[in-house]
């Protein structure tokens, strides 16, 4: 069964690039452009993984992750993992990975596969 990934990023180029990369690798990808759009999409679909930008407009990321407890989340950010930890964003057990932008395409695909137990 095809896994579904929700990509949430306010940067259209990043959002669409990640979508294309993942679709080419066999995933069903849904996108959201900010925190509010993310929460709206989650009412419509339950993805297997959310790739979530840490810094974007709309509902703050800390509020989003409080509402999502049963879906794996991997952060995408230009900030360092230590900065995310300082903000308390890595405390939930469903936070499974952290991708620092810019990221390597093959690394992204490999790590998503590992997260979804496909590699």
Could you say what each language-model-derived stretch is?
Residues 16-24:
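Charged docking surfaces used in two-component/phosphorelay signaling
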Residues 31-40, 61:
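Helix N-cap/capping motif at the beta->alpha junctions
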Residues 62-63, 80-99, 106, 110:
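Alpha4 helix (beta4-alpha4-beta5 surface) of REC/receiver domains from two-component response regulators
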Residues 56:
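Receiver (REC) domain active-site loop signature in two-component systems and cognate sites
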Residues 7-9, 32, 50:
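Conserved sequence signature across two-component system core domains
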Residues 53:
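Active-site residues of response regulator receiver
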Residues 108-119:
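Receiver (REC) domain switch/output surface
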Residues 76-78:
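Hydrophobic/aromatic residues positioned on beta-strands within the core alpha/beta folds
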């Amino acid at each position: 069964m095809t896994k579904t990934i929700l990509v949430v990023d306010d940067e259209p180029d990043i959002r669409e690039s990640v979508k294309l990369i993942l679709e080419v690798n066999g995933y069903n990808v849904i996108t959201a452009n900010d925190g509010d759009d993310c929460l709206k999409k989650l009412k419509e679909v339950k993805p297997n993984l959310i790739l979530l930008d840490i810094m974007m407009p709309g509902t703050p990321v800390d509020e989003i992750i409080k509402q999502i407890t049963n879906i794996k989340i991997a952060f995408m950010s230009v900030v360092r993992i230590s900065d995310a930890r300082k903000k308390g964003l890595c405390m939930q057990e469903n936070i499974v990975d952290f991708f620092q932008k810019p990221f390597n395409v093959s690394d992204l695909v490999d790590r998503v596969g590992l997260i979804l137990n496909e590699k």
